[in-house]
Amino acid sequence: MKLRKWIAAALAITALLAAGCGSQSDNGADKKELVYSKSQGPYSELFEQGVKPILEAKGYKLVGKDMSDLLQADVVLNDGEVDFNVEQHTAYMENFNQKQGGKLAAITPIPTVPAGIYPGKKSDLKEIAAGDHIAVPNDAANTARAYALLQKAGWIKLNPQKDLSTVTQADIIENPYNLRFTEMKSLNIPAVRTDFDFIVITGSIVYNAKINPQTALLTEDILPHLLLQLVVREKDKDAKWVKDIADAYHSVEFKEYMQKNNKGLWYVPEEK
């Protein structure tokens, strides 16, 4: 009787260990079922149309989980509810890690929609005049992008001692046109564009507002830390599935997709 009980116990332990190993495999480096955060905008759409089919051909099953904003997307990624996202640049991710105690890692730059100066009441950069009113985004990373772009246009000069990725309105040292700036939520800018002489908006806002990107009067020179990235948890960065996603973005199939479908919206990072 004791022998039977011992055998039964041993079998039960073996079964539990096997189940544990199976669970580890499902959640480990070689897993084939992946969950990603998604939102309305060009980046999720680009992934789903141009990258997802490449991964599915390799046997992956991919499930999108809708998120209301990027902060929520990073929280659920950091907590392990999703495996990756493709909607943020390095500057945003690093700010999240610092402010929220995150442990996220950027893997590879991916196509990015640049910020631009777009028409408001005026439709030509040459129409700039004293006292003109310009709308710019109010979140830190995109505010800096906006002022860097306005400097590129020659309308202001920023303190050269400051990092362009962190400049604010306070860093303007020359404003020859005495321009007025209103910093506001990016999503709200397109709806009030005719209240301003010019507006500065990011690519995702251009896309969501269905603004023709070819109407941009000037676009930014995208700094490396403002390129969109494939982002995962730090502990997953060496997983095979992460490499496969990165490889898909750099594949011949994806390049062909971009050549066919890029209508002037996307800046595509150069291969190193």
PLM region spans:
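C-terminal motif of bacterial Sec signal peptides marking the signal peptidase cleavage site
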Residues: 15-20
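Bacterial signal peptide processing site
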Residues: 22-25
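Short, polar/charged alpha-helical segment
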Residues: 40-65
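Short helix-initiation/N-cap motifs at beta->coil->alpha
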Residues: 64-75, 163-191
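Ligand-binding "clamshell"
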Residues: 95-107, 122-123, 195, 208-219
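A conserved helix-loop-strand patch within extracytoplasmic ligand-binding domains
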Residues: 107-156, 255-256
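A bilobed periplasmic-binding-protein/Venus flytrap-type ligand-binding module shared by bacterial periplasmic
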Residues: 114-125, 226-239
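Periplasmic-binding protein-like
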Residues: 143-151, 249-270
